[in-house]
């Protein structure tokens, strides 16, 4: 009889523990759906608050014109605000590399070609190259038109220390060696149409059938309209906007991220900007 009593007691104890575990799991599961429940020892769970329906609102976000993009960018680097070009490039380049890592793992996209232009958009690409190298990718940079400013010389010097090859030219057949191409040629300052050597590079990229990711905007498009004066622009598979997306990307139908997360509260208030909510310490958000 003592043995039977022990077995029944043990069975009840195990059942009670299992019930607590299941109740705890249900608590967290239901909390995810904005319903707060308190696990009890009763048959059912006792509701503590009203539940709310999962109506997902469309993300509110400001799309910047070319003029406003330039104005905000200049203000960010003014003495009044305090950013430097180097700081903004580092923040942008890091978020670019983190988004690339999220979407294109190095086990599948081992070798990356980053095509950089002579301006700040190209500088973002040079920074991203360094981080992607640390993330385990085999990175090569195409930099056909070198910027002579000290900042860009220092970025190139860093690439040497990370053993990243920098090319000055490229043949169409060379693109077969890469799994992913990053378009960091032209940013929001671009006007007109692509000129040599970038017109040929854009054509080669579009003809390569490789996965292409554009930084800020697909190179060659009009920042405000999203069109191209001569139909020569990067046909990218994904775009990573910086600061805020540009007006020309309102109808962008492919995967679209926002990276950077560096607009101060004062600028947001001054220009009445609608900035999406970033998750905790995440420097990017999918649009």
Swiss-Prot record:
One of its GO terms (molecular function) is nucleotide binding. It catalyses: (6R)-NADHX = (6S)-NADHX; (6R)-NADPHX = (6S)-NADPHX. (6S)-NADPHX binds at residues 120-124, 187-193, 216. The keyword Transmembrane helix does not apply. InterPro entries: YjeF_N_dom, YjeF_N_dom_sf, YJEFN_prot_NAXE-like. Transmembrane segments: none annotated. Gene3D superfamilies: YjeF N-terminal domain. Its EC number is 5.1.99.6. Binds 1 potassium ion per subunit. GO terms for cellular component: mitochondrion. Its cofactor is K(+). Belongs to the NnrE/AIBP family. Catalyzes the epimerization of the S- and R-forms of NAD(P)HX, a damaged form of NAD(P)H that is a result of enzymatic or heat-dependent hydration. This is a prerequisite for the S-specific NAD(P)H-hydrate dehydratase to allow the repair of both epimers of NAD(P)HX. This is NAD(P)H-hydrate epimerase. It comes from Plasmodium falciparum (isolate 3D7). The lineage of its organism: Eukaryota, Sar, Alveolata, Apicomplexa, Aconoidasida.
